[in-house]
Regions:
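ER/Golgi luminal nucleotide-sugar-dependent glycosyltransferases, focusing on the catalytic module
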Residues: 1-265
């Protein structure tokens, strides 16, 4: 069994996790509670938290803490409402019983992989009225979206919920090694691995962040900050990262999907 060092990103007090493997990382506007890791000093993007969400801490971790980790240490990221849980968990999970089910280490079998990413979610199957309301421009180009779930892919879903054409604009700003492959990925898949959560080791995490954040900086020149508003686009940089993570870890690592649960806190 291999222990995992977790970083749980939150803007609310979390007082129900009992395991020392879980380090609480603060991204809230108020002063951080005692014992929480702050990410508003040294090399940081704390002023972008509104638009970057949990990536605010991820960036700080990359710049200030990752180099201090041991090469063979398993490192995981979660967030205040979403947690990794043990395999084969069937019970309903709440604050009172979550410590019984929280993932704290990897089995010998899981240790053979390079990374763990969240079990995927399917994003096709929207009702036709919603497709017509939010996806009409996509339907004009591909009418089969209305009749076949296969065509309700990641790109269509992003266009509907986070601004038509925004994902394609962002993909054009990727390095050539990923540009075509990621575009193909979002066109042929109608599921992705959500929440910008992963478990891996130092070498891969470093490579991931070295790819992700320079791309997001280029995206900032396209989308900026002032015009981002509402659910659709305020956190567009997090939404882009969420889709890109699914593609990147599958392309560059020997990955395994793992269960997670939403916790209403």
């Amino acid at each position: 069994m291999k222990k995992i060092k977790f970083y749980c990103v939150t803007n609310k007090l979390i007082n129900f996790i009992k395991f020392e493997e879980y380090n609480l990382a603060w991204v809230g506007k108020n002063n951080s509670p005692t014992g929480y890791i702050r990410c508003d000093y040294n090399d940081n993007i704390f002023y972008k938290e509104k638009n970057y969400s949990e990536l605010t801490f991820h960036y700080w971790y990359w710049k200030n803490l990752l180099s201090l980790e041991k090469d063979d240490q398993w490192i995981g990221f979660c967030q205040k409402r979403r947690y990794w849980i043990k395999n084969n968990t069937k019970d309903s999970i709440n604050k009172e019983n979550i410590n019984k089910y929280l993932l704290t280490n990897l089995s010998d079998e899981q240790n053979k992989f390079d990374s763990l990413i969240c079990d995927s979610i399917k994003i096709s199957g929207a009702k036709n009225i919603k497709l017509l309301k939010r996806g009409w421009r996509n339907i004009l180009k591909e009418p089969r979206i209305l009749f076949n779930d296969k065509y309700q892919n990641i790109k269509v879903h992003f266009d509907m919920h986070h601004g038509y054409g925004n994902l394609e604009k962002a993909i054009k700003l990727l390095d050539k090694d990923d540009r075509d492959d990621f575009y193909e990925y979002v066109k042929v898949n109608n599921y992705f691995n959500p929440h910008i959560m992963f478990i891996s080791k130092k070498k891969i995490i470093k490579r991931w962040f070295e790819t992700l954040f320079p791309w997001l900086e280029r995206c900032e020149k396209e989308f900026g900050f002032k015009t981002l508003n509402g659910y659709d686009t305020t956190r567009i940089y997090a939404y882009l990262s969420e889709r890109f993570l699914s593609y990147w870890f599958k392309k560059y690592t020997n990955y395994k999907e793992h269960p997670w649960r939403f916790l209403d806190v």
